[in-house]
Amino acid sequence: MPRDEREEDKKYMLTPEQESKIATAYERFRWAAKEAERLFDMPLVVRYSGGKDSDVILQLAKESGVSFRVTHNLTTADPPDNVYYIRRVFARLREEGIDCRIDVPRRSLWRIMRETLVIPSRVMRVCCGELKERRMADAPYIVTGVRWAESAGRRAKSGIAMVHAEHPSTSARYTGGEQVAAAAGLLTTDDASSRRLFEQCRMRGVRVLNPIIDWSDDDVWDYLHSRGIEGNPLYKEGWTRIGCVGCPLAGRRARELAFARYPKLYKAWHDAIAYVIERRKEMGNPMILMGRPVE
């Protein structure tokens, strides 16, 4: 958890295991950077969200000495305070000579809902692909802060570095698979055979590195504090997850907290949902909730 009270000059001592994880993360960055250069003649692209995991991978990228750029995908449902925080971080990055940009979507979440007549849910994630996971042509190799500790579902995923390829020939065999991964310190699970280093997705041609996939929450916070990084101010106000306001993947308490703080975004959700329900009723295709049409 974030440290609310601490002396300014206090040094947070990391454990040998944590120091080892940091060193391994450096190697993951360096391996991926070489691959990005070899395959695309481009630097890595760090996907920055403003959350604690993003702060970690950004700092690790700096410390690893690799060439990289930073991007943030604006979703139009972002907490305004998070947008302000990202702008401050990016201003400092530009002062350091690091290329960074905020990518604005073609359609807002509210327009997507009105045009698709779908309300985002845990099952119907119509928003994520276009707003959060959209690919940029000049970002073929990205870095994210995905971690197994965030959810059981992510632990079931195979990868520290996942390759999403448009052609089936681009697979683990393409780069030597587990042998290359092990040599680079990428494959750290006890049962490597149960986890593929690379995954394939024909829908997008992009490679993804998740350098802190095996870090715990304590690893994340201890690392940030050891570097003097306070992180997003929203954490100190009780937020445990920095993401879209009203996201159905967040818990009910998190949504209530966000809506109370940002009433304009609550109204945007309310109006878009009301439009979808009414329009579908007019079309004879009403929304169904608990087996009954929504009136």
Where are these regions (language model features)?
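Nucleotide-activated chemistry modules centered on ATP-dependent adenylation/adenylyltransferase
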Residues: M1-E295
